[in-house]
Amino acid sequence: MQLLEERILTDGNILGENILKVDNFLTHQVDYRLMKAIGKVFAQKYAEAGITKVVTIEASGIAPAVYAAEAMDVPMIFAKKHKNITMTEGILTAEVYSFTKQVTSTVSIAGKFLSKEDKVLIIDDFLANGQAAKGLIEIIGQAGAQVVGVGIVIEKSFQDGRRLIEDMGIEVTSLARIKNFENGNLNFLEADA
């Protein structure tokens, strides 16, 4: 997605050897116009897939996921990273390790929001090692629902996340694919949409 790649080049900050900071339009402050455009691209890509739910994980996946859900006219569900006292029964959970934060979290979704009839599109802000997507795939599987695809805003293609998901037989659609970070710059691969 050219608009997204241009925004990354303009406003993204490279930290260290493999961290891209995009807090001024995605991970802290949200550019809703860009998120709306991202949502439309995912909706067009999966228009014929019969998506019934969009699922993400809190927090930075929520903005692109809600706009994708709006464009598809389906509900959006986000997995919670912290135990909530109001979620007391029928909870679907998975362990997710965050390489960025160096912690393992138990993420959860109330089972009443997913059923075996659902066709789910997972949306997330980043794909690196694939652990967040893997955890969501596990949760959706516990409900007996079908994961149709995984939509990613920014993929770090030099890490193993895409391979992990595709090895499960699930399609990955990334709107910006980073080949590498080199001398304080980044290089893109061709995006999926």
From Swiss-Prot:
Keywords: Cytoplasm, Glycosyltransferase, Purine salvage, Transferase. Its main location: cytoplasm. Xanthine binds at residues 20, 27, 156. Pathway: Purine metabolism; XMP biosynthesis via salvage pathway; XMP from xanthine: step 1/1. One of its GO terms (biological process) is XMP salvage. GO terms for cellular component: cytoplasm. Its EC number is 2.4.2.22. It catalyses: XMP + diphosphate = xanthine + 5-phospho-alpha-D-ribose 1-diphosphate. One of its GO terms (molecular function) is xanthine phosphoribosyltransferase activity. The keyword Transferase applies. SUPFAM superfamilies: PRTase-like (SSF53271). Gene3D superfamilies: 3.40.50.2020. It is an enzyme of class 2 (transferase). InterPro entries: PRibTrfase_dom (IPR000836), PRTase-like (IPR029057), Pur/Pyrimidine_PRTase (IPR050118), Xanthine_PRibTrfase (IPR010079). It is found in: Cytoplasm. Belongs to the purine/pyrimidine phosphoribosyltransferase family. Xpt subfamily. Homodimer. Converts the preformed base xanthine, a product of nucleic acid breakdown, to xanthosine 5'-monophosphate (XMP), so it can be reused for RNA or DNA synthesis. This is Xanthine phosphoribosyltransferase. It comes from Streptococcus pyogenes serotype M1.
